[in-house]
Every structure is written in structure tokens, then in C-alpha cells.
A protein has these predicted regions:
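C-terminal tail/sorting-segment detector
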Residues: 5, 588-600
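A residue-level detector for well-ordered beta-strand positions
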Residues: 33, 328, 571-572
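N-terminal prosegments of processed precursors
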Residues: 23-131, 416
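Short, solvent-exposed loop/turn elements at domain surfaces
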Residues: 42-44, 52-56, 72, 81-83, ...
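Propeptide-to-catalytic entry region of secreted or membrane-anchored zinc metalloproteases
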Residues: 99-329, 340-349, 447, 452-554
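Extracellular hydrolytic enzyme modules, especially secreted metalloproteases
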Residues: 260-262, 266-439, 449-450
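Bacterial Sec-dependent N-terminal signal peptides
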Residues: 1-26
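Residue-level detector of functionally pivotal "anchor" positions at catalytic/ligand-binding pockets or at interdomain
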Residues: 553-580
Length: 600
């Protein structure tokens, strides 16, 4: 058994050490302006995911939310954060005492990062592989509970009708809360990505009111370690239980388990700028009994509202209660279907380490502020059993390659020594469901999956320097969103530019892909320390409204031009073995007038 298999087996042994596991969307990258109790304004940023997260000012000073105000954080010997008595301010407004506290914080920052890594590593070693995922073919019935709190109720107009449209409708209209910002409903998204093979039907109940206030469930810890999430799920089910005449309709595969229940809760999510007392959007395995031998496997939980700089006033107060985008909901639901996070869950960020906004399981859930999440990639569609990729074995010309969501095909170049490792080639067009993508072009990425099965616990891109699902960037550099932003190594504008230049030709106008270009992730692994060339090169990559055209060549075959028009040959043709042929055969490579050509 290889070490990857051993590691996965160990993870499964640890199933018996824990009963509950959660997976979540990362914090929405962006700055939020808040008004402090002394009347000053402070710009803050949020990082991490629901397992461990933190907040900093625009220059990187750690702060703690206490009672709605942000205080300079103290770091204790265990690396934990607590609020000091000093309100946080922008750099130019800090007095000497605040500056001294920040200097002490800076001297102890290594303790905080060590604690963060320990928390995340512990989580990685105690995640159970539960199975029992939501079926993803045909029509699947899914219960959706609208849950309010004793001190927080739904404020969007007509919540039941609004979420019927949000979840099930083919048309998005504004009902007073920017509902039409969402490009599609959740159902429509999956119908498009599966070419009509998967049609989830969401049955809405509520709103129900839970027995406690929001902070009881959301907790008060700045790092999110005290959420009462299991109690939240149980209370929501208890309040909705009598509204469900027959729970068995939500057991879609007849195994005695309700695969997934969705909860949309009133207010904001902590992952999108909500206060410390709010709940972080997540997918979670809870195993809750609903009677008659039925248990609920997974919960998909996301908030009512979207927090953005364009819908708050100068005091940091929401002035427009926008409905949330579908991106977070779809990301979490995809976990309940078995897909893992493709972002780096350890928060040790590295460039060229993932899919970034090209994948809904990475940062693509937040495209267009999460109102237009990225379509499933070819890899995900194949994992779901919706569309198989075509394996490339010989040189060929591809003309007008369309995206899969438009009926196109995707190709993969497989490592002959390892069937789980391959290069994926697919078309992405900035239109339709992907109209808010960062560019159109040929998306190329490397898959080196550690097992023959995909599981939501996998975290394939956590091995720094050896990502398992990662883009081959045309420009040679795909920045990690975690390294961009105010006070970071890169600006948000630079990150966006790297996205646009990561496809072929892209903004970098790269029209070929060969091994000697030494682009990140364009190779196969021999072992952990050595790589080898892929064995195929791409040439003459062009983009038009009709799709992406290019040549795939076996490495070492020179000067293969665009395919000839099929006609009666007027000169001699020879095979690569030097045998003359009178009539060329479609799809084969020949020597013709001292050039290699593919006959069509």
C-alpha cells in the first residue's frame, strides 16, 4: 500500500474519534468599513474559514470584535487572541499606547500562526469520511428550512417566494432585495452544469423561529471555536419536524437516510462580513434522528444576506438588504455531493497551488460577488458522472472547442504510469453561465488525485508544492487570492490580472504550451521529488466566438499545420514509417511535401 493510501486509511480509522465534521467556504476576500464607538472609521479584512478565522486592519494588525467594536488583539502564550481595552484605528490615527500594543502583537505574531496551523492540522486528522452523499442524477428532493432567531428575523420581502425563485426558478426577477443579481437559481445552475442530468427540487418550509438568540448559536469567539452549530441544526429540525408529512421523500436513494437538509438562516454569515456572533456558512455531517428509522446525514447552511461595500452607509450599517448570492449555497451543497475544497484549507498560501476563481470549489464560488459562481469544471463533471473527458493519444487538430456547458468536449492527457494523473484541456467562454469569468480561453490544469475515489475530506491542494488539482497558468503565474489585498504581497488588481492571463491565449497572448516553457504544473510526477514531461504540446491556440482552436502534437513531432481539406491527394503521402500511401486515411499523420500533416 502506498503512503497516500495509508494516510487515507488512517483518516478513516479516526472516524471513531469524532462524530461531527464540517466543510465551509473560505472568508470572502474584501474590505469592510465599520464605524467605531468613538466615531472613527476602520477598514477591516477577514481571513480563514469556519474552522479558524481572524480579522485584521488594512495594514495587518489583528483585531477582535467585542460588542460590535473592534479592539487591538493581544496574543497569549498559547497563540490565542483576546481583546485589549484599546480601540483599533487606522494607522495615521493611532496614539502612542496603541502603537506600543501593536508592536507587542507583532513580536508575538509567530505564536498566533503556530496556533492556527495546529488547529487546522488537528482538524485534518479528525475528519471522518462519512459517505452517504446526495445523489446527483435525476430529480432529487431536498428539504430547505428557513430559520430565524429570537432576536433576528428575515427582512427580505416575501421570503418563501423569494427563496422559491432563488432555489428553483428559471427566471430571476427583483422582489425588492436585488434578487435578480443572481444569474441563475441553484436548480438551474446544476441543470446547466449536468446537461440536464441533475435536477434538484427544493421544498421550502418556514420561516421557523429557533428557541435562542443568534449569539447563542454563533458564539463570541473571534476565531470561531465556540459555535453551537450542532444545536442550531437540531433546533431547526425540531421546529420544522411537524411541517413534514413524510420524511421518506427526502431519502432519495432508499438507504434509510435523508442525504441533505438545507438551512437558510436570517441575517448575515460570518464568512461574508457578519459579526462575531453570526454563523459561518458551512456543510456539516450531523447524523440527526428524525424518527421512523430515518437520520439526516448532511446539512447545507448559508445566510439570508450578502454584505458588501456598496450596500452599507457611512456608519457601516446595511442600507439595502441584498439577498445572498447562490455561490456559497452551491459550494456547500457540492460538499454534500462529495466534492472537496480545492482552496488551501491550512491557510499557508502559495501561488500556482490551486484553481482560484476557475472552480466553484476554490474561489470561483465568489464570482460576481457570488451571484454568478463558476460552472463545474470538466474534472468535476466527470467525477459526478455527467460527462466523460476524451483521452488524447495522438496528435490532432481541435477546431472551435466549446465549453462543456455549451455542449462541448474536454480532453485529457493521461500519465501512462498513473491513471489518476492527467492534464485537462477545456474551453471557457465569457458568456452564459460563465459571463462573469475573468477571461475566455483554453483552461489547462493538472490533476494528480491521490486516490481513485473523490471524497469531501480530501483537501487535495494542501500539500505545498504538489497541488493535486491546479491550473497551468499561461503567463507562468496564477496568484493565490490569500496573498492579495491591502498590505499583502500583491494587490487585488494584480490577482485579477493574473486570472485573466492564466488561460490561453488570454491577456498574455500565449498561443502555445510546451514542456520547455517550464510552466507551473505542466508535467507528470515520477515521484515526490522528480517530474517528467507530459509528452504532448499545444500550438496555434486561437480564440473566437466559435470557440477555441489549437493543435495537439506529440512532443518531438515538428511543424504539424492545420488539417488539410479532405480531397484526392495530388502528390505522394508517406506514413511516419516511410510507407507511401495512395489515399490518406482520416485522422492519421503523414509526411507531405517535407511537412508533417494530419489528414481530415
Amino acid at each position: 500500500m502506498d503512503k497516500d493510501a495509508i494516510f487515507r486509511s488512517l483518516l478513516r480509522v479516526v472516524v471513531f474519534l469524532t462524530a461531527i465534521s464540517t466543510w465551509a467556504a473560505p472568508a470572502i476576500r474584501g474590505r469592510f468599513t465599520v464605524r467605531q464607538p468613538d466615531g472613527t472609521f476602520l477598514t477591516i479584512e477577514q481571513f480563514g474559514d469556519e474552522h479558524h478565522h481572524w480579522t485584521s486592519t488594512s495594514d495587518g494588525t489583528l483585531v477582535v470584535n467585542q460588542g460590535g467594536a473592534y479592539y487591538v488583539a493581544a496574543i497569549d502564550d498559547a497563540g490565542c487572541l483576546s481583546a485589549t481595552s484599546i480601540l483599533a484605528h487606522e494607522a495615521q490615527e493611532r496614539d502612542s499606547k496603541e502603537q506600543q500594543l501593536i508592536a507587542v502583537q507583532t513580536s508575538r505574531i509567530a505564536l498566533f500562526h503556530q496556533r492556527r496551523d495546529e488547529v487546522l492540522m488537528t482538524r485534518a486528522m479528525t475528519i471522518p469520511s462519512t459517505g452517504g452523499y446526495l445523489p446527483h442524477k435525476g430529480t432529487t428532493r431536498i428539504l430547505t428550512i428557513l430559520a430565524a432567531f429570537q432576536d433576528s428575523t428575515f427582512t427580505i420581502n416575501e421570503p418563501v417566494q423569494a427563496y422559491e425563485q432563488y432555489l428553483n426558478s428559471d427566471i430571476q426577477t427583483d422582489m425588492g432585495n436585488k434578487n435578480h443579481n443572481n444569474l441563475t437559481s441553484v436548480q438551474q445552475y446544476f441543470k446547466i452544469c449536468s446537461q440536464g442530468q441533475f435536477c434538484p427540487q427544493f421544498d421550502i418550509v418556514g420561516p421557523v423561529t429557533l428557541p435562542h438568540e443568534l449569539a447563542y448559536y454563533g458564539g463570541t469567539s473571534e476565531t470561531g471555536q465556540d459555535e453551537m452549530f450542532s444545536t442550531f441544526c437540531k433546533d431547526a429540525v425540531t421546529q420544522a419536524k411537524d411541517m413534514i408529512p413524510d420524511w421518506t421523500v427526502y431519502d432519495n436513494d432508499g438507504d434509510g437516510n435523508v442525504e441533505m437538509v438545507c438551512i437558510i438562516y436570517a441575517g448575515y454569515g460570518q464568512n461574508q462580513g457578519g459579526g462575531v456572533e453570526t454563523i459561518w456558512a458551512k456543510a456539516s455531517h450531523q447524523n440527526i434522528d428524525v424518527g421512523n428509522g430515518l437520520r439526516i446525514n448532511y446539512f447545507n447552511c448559508s445566510p439570508e444576506h450578502y454584505y458588501s461595500l456598496d450596500n452599507i452607509d457611512a456608519q457601516g450599517v446595511a442600507i439595502k438588504d441584498y439577498i445572498n448570492g447562490t455561490g456559497v449555497f452551491i459550494h456547500e451543497m457540492s460538499h454534500c455531493m462529495g466534492l472537496p475544497d480545492l482552496y488551501q484549507t491550512y491557510n499557508k498560501f502559495l501561488n500556482n497551488q490551486g484553481m482560484e476563481s476557475w472552480d466553484v470549489m476554490d474561489y470561483g464560488f465568489d464570482n460576481h460577488n457570488s451571484f454568478a459562481p463558476t460552472a463545474y469544471t470538466a474534472w468535476e463533471q466527470e467525477v459526478m458522472g455527467w460527462k466523460e473527458m476524451e483521452t488524447v493519444t495522438t496528435s490532432r487538430h481541435i477546431n472551435g472547442l466549446l465549453p462543456l456547458v455549451e455542449g462541448g468536449t474536454a480532453y485529457k492527457i493521461v500519465n501512462a504510469a498513473k491513471e489518476n494523473e492527467y492534464i485537462v484541456i477545456e474551453s471557457v467562454m465569457k458568456r452564459g453561465i460563465n459571463q462573469y469569468a475573468y477571461n475566455s480561453g483554453l483552461l489547462v490544469y493538472h490533476v494528480d488525485y491521490p486516490s481513485s475515489k473523490v471524497d469531501m475530506l480530501d483537501a487535495p491542494n494542501n500539500e505545498l508544492g504538489h497541488p493535486r488539482v491546479a491550473v497551468v497558468p499561461a503567463s507562468g503565474l496564477l496568484l493565490n487570492v490569500g496573498l492579495s489585498g491591502t498590505g499583502k504581497e500583491y494587490t487585488q488588481a494584480q490577482w485579477r490580472a493574473s486570472m485573466g492571463a492564466s488561460v490561453f491565449p488570454g491577456t498574455a497572448q500565449v498561443t502555445s504550451l510546451t514542456s520547455d516553457m517550464n510552466l507551473p504544473n505542466y508535467y507528470f510526477y515520477v515521484n515526490d521529488d522528480a517530474t517528467m514531461p507530459v509528452g504532448f504540446d499545444l500550438y496555434d491556440i486561437t480564440e473566437s466566438a466559435d470557440g477555441i482552436s489549437f493543435d495537439i502534437r506529440v512532443s518531438g513531432e515538428d511543424d504539424i499545420h492545420s488539417p488539410l481539406v479532405t480531397t484526392t491527394p495530388d502528390q505522394d503521402f508517406y506514413t511516419l514509417q516511410g510507407v507511401r500511401v495512395a489515399v490518406p486515411t482520416k485522422g492519421n499523420i503523414y509526411i507531405h511535401q517535407e511537412h508533417l500533416m494530419i489528414w481530415r
